[in-house]
Swiss-Prot record:
Name of this protein: Argininosuccinate synthase
Organism for this UniProt entry: Rhodopirellula baltica (strain DSM 10527 / NCIMB 13988 / SH1)
Key words, A-Z: Amino-acid biosynthesis, Arginine biosynthesis, ATP-binding, Cytoplasm, Ligase, Nucleotide-binding
Pathway recorded for this protein: Amino-acid biosynthesis; L-arginine biosynthesis; L-arginine from L-ornithine and carbamoyl phosphate: step 2/3
Cellular component per GO, a single term: cytoplasm
Amino acid sequence: MKSCVLAYSGGLDTSVILGWLQDQGYEVHCVYVDLGQPCEDRDAIMEKARTCGAKSSRLVDVREELCRDFAFPVLAWQAKYEQIYLLGTSIARPLISKVCLEVAREVGATAYAHGATGKGNDQCRFQLAAEALDPNIEMIAPWRIKSFRDAFPGRTELIEYCDVKRIPVKASTAKPYSSDENVLHISYEAGKLEELDVNGVELVEFGMGVSPQDAPDKPEEVTIGFESGVPKTLNGKAVNALEMVEQLNDIAGRNGVGRIDMVENRFVGMKSRGVYESPGMTVLYDALMYVEQLTMDRDLMHLRDRMAPEVAEMVYYGFWYTPKMDALMSFIETAQRPVTGEVTLQLYKGNIMVSSRTSPNSLYDEEIATMEGGGSYNQDDAEGFLRIQGLPSRVQGRVSPRKF
């Protein structure tokens, strides 16, 4: 019998896909990848999969790995897709594929199935990651298969299939949008959010924090310490990557930090609207930036900043396991070596303001930077500097005089 691993959530879609795969003659191994998504009873989901005919089911907790090995390297790049999206969903997908393929190798499965649609980005991220890790894996994306779409044109048919197969599904009140959550962020899209005249921030019931208007009237300070670009301490206490993100989610969330509403360019060609909240990661991006301002060489920082949009694109599109990304990650690891220090931020009604920053590797020299008289900067040196810098402009001006 053919064997398949299924990225399984226990929801309606993957419950139906589990049954459908068995109808197609597959032995199915269900994998629930714990990224920090909300779930009432993970044990019940695993039992449900086995009850519904799965050969095996397992939960794999990768929350720490997601923060440490995926989100934090992207943070070091200050990578934001189209300038504002912190890639909370995008960066989780290659990890899901990695976990599912590890299980496939263990159980001898030759196929990998997921429930992503044929119109979104996730299908790209799942498949590009999986085929990079195992070029021989058979990808099964039911929503890209016409016979599956014909059988299940809507939610009603999905529920009817579950009734016939005696697959237990919990009835839920349909919200006017869909959401996807992990420890890094929550994304909201589709439904009423596809109407651009709808105020997304007012429509969405945010799950990670309060609105800026409802945040406390007094600023809250938070101090974050970095070692070579990696967040290590929070308010003076050493924490692991997961603890850092979870605790900052609470702190930043209660101060209304980290909400965005954007229209983005999907990899598959269309524009789509997304509303996102990433309170903890938003604070980390700003905190790291302030330590970098002290410690990174100017030209190195500017080079990183020019390359960061390309890194964001690669993550967003799904090109995580590539030689190019490997090289880029080696670069950023070297670039971040001096980025050690501590920064104190004030969080106030959605805003992030720096209070202080310090670093043993600081390149800031008050004696050089002072605008007062004296200091160690000799202003006479600027004369020769500007004569050399201005030479091309003077020559060009003689050859092609500008009208003014």
